[in-house]
Swiss-Prot record:
Superkingdom, taxonomy of origin: Eukaryota
Residues forming coiled coils: 254-315
Job description of the protein: Required for 60S pre-ribosomal subunits export to the cytoplasm.
Residues the record lists as Phosphothreonine modifications: 551
Organism: Rattus norvegicus (Rat)
Listed name of the protein: Protein SDA1 homolog
Cross-referenced InterPro entries: ARM-type_fold (IPR016024), Sda1 (IPR027312), SDA1_C (IPR048292), SDA1_MD (IPR007949), SDA1_N (IPR012977)
Modified residues (Phosphoserine): 232, 234, 236, 584, 588, 594
UniProt entry tagged with the keyword Nucleus: yes
Keyword vocabulary terms for this entry: Coiled coil, Nucleus, Phosphoprotein, Protein transport, Ribosome biogenesis, Transport
Annotated stretches, region: Disordered: 484-508, 563-586, 604-649
Length: 686
């Protein structure tokens, strides 16, 4: 009889639910019976909404499951649940409140509820002190908005929700405001709400008095797009000669130290050219979408000056302000004196503050403002009373600042810093060399003659711009080589950067010279270019740029010619006997600035004894013990009497005759044993 009772439909809701989904018209009467039962339970529940009701929870889920089968009967069911949650969500039983929310989510997934009204209700429910409920609502909100914008951007719904979230960010309940901010950040990262309105709503959270909201907003703006994390070494076929081409050229030619040096130098120049095509500093799209970055940065600076938060929060504010100034090239002159107050070697996280100073430097800042910053760094860090690491950090910071604002460097300060090229500390010496190397490309005339090095074509053409000057060219630099090659009919000859593949065979078996072609006609072309004045070169380049449509091959030739300028000596000068073996990361400026650029030490400091011991012990964790364990002939045999005697409890042995009659060693025996032990130890030490 028990099996039959389980099949009775009025009392078996799961079975009735299954049958209704299969054939809704056949079970209308059973449904109406349960619906009336639900109404009566709901009326009773409204009298005491703070009491749990398991029967009501089952009926609500039953109605939500079959809501699509009888839409005309259950048209008021979703609104009734929403009203109940809206008015009584603070007093409802947690399990019953979760059931009501799950029922609404189920109805929304079946598209029986308007998304705007439901999501607004769920945002209000984020005020509840129920962590599991908040997590469930957060997941549904993000997923639902993602599904709404799956096929196309639903601007009508998005605008309503964004306006509502803007009010939620100013809500008195910190938890609800924080969850609303998390929703917007998550939707932006998923490229669902990646518009300017979302970003500017998040900017308002940067001025919140609630620390958690402030930190979340600052962390969002200090992040990076996932696209930037891709490997920067990816190369395309149209980007000129690749590293693979150079390696193939070396592999198919003669092996020798000369060709090996040529390969290394060519690889360095190639890597430098590749880095020039990388995105600029702080390429995070959210910062670019801010409507008024100048006003935003000024408000942040005002907040920073009166901020009473922890030091870490102040550092985040400084970081964001410096990024805003660096990206948008803002005029925020009060920021630099504020940063100068913290530029002391003993200051906590001083390397990060130096990084912020470099980030906030750009060519539109008046040079006298940056000069004050440079002098502060030089006076506080680059002095002989400080350690080598402190001096290195100071020179590195000066180098990064002047790379972004070259006019700020004075000739007197540069010559003083260049003298550290012969410093006894290797880190200081190498940092000074990198600074000299930087100004060889920016403005060699500021260096003393002995520090300028052998001039190249690129260094001769280099000219430092005046304050506010724009270098707008009406021609493609290097385009003059195209017309010359056309005149000399050297279509089949490359000018020193012959591309090679695995299928090519060289007649003489030698590696192609990457510096200059040995062909007589190419030498004649090079001589014509060398003898041509700079103004005539520009005129020819402008004529070529405007008179012909350049192909990919033409652009590749131009790139190769520009790369040759950085490798070859200037006209009338001898080739360099050797090139300075600089770190490849030092060769390109204006790229992504990281803390490693400020803290770079070319020679690692010696670690103390504790660090060495910790490293040694960490390496021994996976090593097996070098102790041979005694093995039995028969592993299943019992233990011997000797083993049993060793393992026996002392309390069982203390009254034994052997223990009581045991005699200890005499003083003489102990002396002899100690002597033998010391002799044995001395032999091991030898």
């Amino acid at each position: 009889m028990s099996g039959r009772n389980n099949n009775k439909l009025p009392s078996n809701l799961p079975q009735l639910q299954n049958l209704i989904k299969r054939d809704p018209p056949a079970y209308v009467e059973e449904f109406l019976q349960q619906y009336n039962h639900y109404k009566s339970n709901m009326e009773i529940f409204k009298l005491q909404p703070n009491k749990p009701s398991k029967e009501l929870a089952e009926l609500v889920m039953f109605m939500a499951q079959i809501g699509h089968c009888y839409p005309e009967h259950l048209s008021e069911f979703p609104q009734e649940l929403k009203d109940l949650l809206s008015y009584n969500h603070t007093v409802l039983d947690p399990d019953l409140r979760m059931t009501f929310c799950k029922a609404l989510i189920l109805l929304r997934n079946k598209n029986l509820i308007n998304p705007s009204d439901l999501l607004e209700l769920f945002f209000e429910l984020l005020r509840c002190r129920d962590k599991l409920l908040r997590k469930t609502l957060y997941t549904h909100i993000v997923t639902d908005i993602k599904n709404i914008n799956a096929k196309h951007k639903n601007n009508k719904v998005n605008v309503v929700l964004q306006n509502f979230m803007y009010t939620m960010l100013r809500d008195s309940n910190a938890t609800a405001a924080k969850m609303s901010l998390d929703v917007m950040i998550e939707l932006y990262r998923r490229n669902i709400w990646n518009d300017a309105k979302t970003v500017n709503v998040i900017t308002t959270a940067c001025f919140s008095k609630i620390t958690k909201i402030l930190v979340a907003a600052l962390t969002f703006f200090l992040g990076k797009d996932e696209e930037e994390k891709q490997d920067s070494d990816s190369e395309s076929e149209d980007d000129g000669p690749t590293a693979r081409d150079l390696l193939v050229q070396y592999a198919t030619g003669k092996k020798g130290s000369k060709n090996k040096k040529k390969l290394e130098k060519a690889m360095k120049v190639l890597k430098k050219q590749k880095k020039k095509k990388k995105p600029e500093v702080f390429n995070f799209s959210a910062i670019h979408l801010i409507h008024d970055p100048q006003d935003f940065a000024e408000k942040l600076l005002k907040q920073l000056e009166s901020c009473k938060e922890r030091f870490e929060v102040k550092m985040m504010l400084m970081n964001l302000i410096s990024r805003l100034v660096g990206i948008h090239e803002l005029f925020l002159f009060n920021f630099y004196p504020f940063v100068q107050r913290f530029l002391q070697p003993h200051q906590r996280e001083v390397t990060k503050i130096l990084l912020f100073a470099a980030q906030a430097s750009h060519h539109l800042v008046p040079p006298e403002i940056i000069q004050s910053l440079l002098l502060t760094v030089a006076n506080n860090f680059v002095t002989d009373k400080n350690s080598g690491e402190v001096m290195t950090v100071g020179i590195n910071a000066i180098k990064e600042i002047t790379a972004r604002c070259p006019l700020a460097m004075t000739e007197e300060l540069l010559q003083d810093l260049a003298q550290y090229k012969t410093h006894k500390d290797k880190n200081v010496m190498m940092s000074a060399r990198t600074l000299i190397h930087l100004f060889r490309t920016l403005n060699p005339q500021m260096l003393q003659k002995k520090f300028r090095g052998k001039p190249t074509e690129a260094s001769i053409e280099a000219r430092i711009q005046e304050y506010g000057e724009l270098d707008a060219k009406d021609y493609i630099p290097g385009a003059e080589v195209l017309e010359l090659e056309k005149e000399e009919n050297t279509e089949n000859d490359e000018d020193g950067w012959e591309s090679a593949s695995l299928s090519e065979e060289e007649e003489d078996g030698e590696w192609v010279d990457v510096h200059h072609s040995s062909d007589e006609e190419q030498q004649a072309v090079a001589k014509k270019l060398d003898s041509m004045p700079m103004e005539e070169r520009k005129a020819k380049a402008a004529a070529v740029s405007t008179s012909r449509v350049l192909t990919q091959d033409d652009f590749q030739k131009i790139r190769m010619a520009q790369m040759k300028k950085e490798m070859d000596a200037a006209p009338g000068k001898a080739q360099k006997r050797k090139y300075l073996d600089m770190d490849s990361d030092e060769e390109s400026r204006g790229e992504l600035l990281s803390l490693r650029d400020i803290e770079r030490l070319h020679k690692k400091p010696k670690s103390d004894k504790e660090t060495r011991l910790a490293t040694a012990m960490a390496g021994r964790t996976d090593r097996k013990e070098f102790v041979r364990k005694k093995t039995k002939i028969n592993p299943f045999s019992s233990s011997t009497n000797k083993e049993k005697k060793k393992q026996k409890n002392f309390m069982m042995m203390r009254y034994s005759q052997n223990v009581r009659s045991k005699t200890s060693r005499s003083f003489r025996e102990k002396q002899l044993a100690l002597r033998d032990a010391l002799l044995k130890k001395r032999k091991r030490m030898k």
